[in-house]
Amino acid sequence: MSNNFKLAPSILSADFSDLQSALHICKSGGADWIHVDVMDNQFVPNLTIGPLVVKSLRPKTRKFIDVHMMVINPETLVEPFAKAGADSITFHIEATDDPNSIIDLIKSCGCKVGISLKPKTPLSDILPFLEKVDLVLVMSVEPGFGGQGFIPKSNDRILELKKYLNENCLDRVLIQVDG
């Protein structure tokens, strides 16, 4: 796996009345991607951004828009976010009983596919799906709120995931760390 990395700041802490300034700060800071945290106040205890925000961002940036859905029933939001301009859509393994159908749906919408897991979810839960995804998002905090402390055991999970990807010729799969 390459040591290259992508810088993908979240707009979750941005001033939502001035997202243009947030995009400018991201660009001037060297961001490669714009990370959009989507929360539904059901899967996690917070409510954030919907497809209309992504739709308003799309004409203002050429950056890769990375949507991280922390929602129940993610299949209901895939198409709206794809149509709004998302380049990548990540869903949580814990939010669905049928990961394969969500992966296929995201791909059919022309987006890159990410799969994520909460800190206490075993890495083994996502292994059967890694051949079909473009990235794995490892949560290093409990999802739902910004400003939490990094969970140190996340380092071991990241190393374990990297080893698995390398040993299984899946080094094209990106590892994303959130938190």
Language-model features: locations:
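Conserved N-terminal beta1-alpha1 strand-loop-helix module at the mouth
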Residues: 1-90, 95-98, 105-108, 112-113, ...
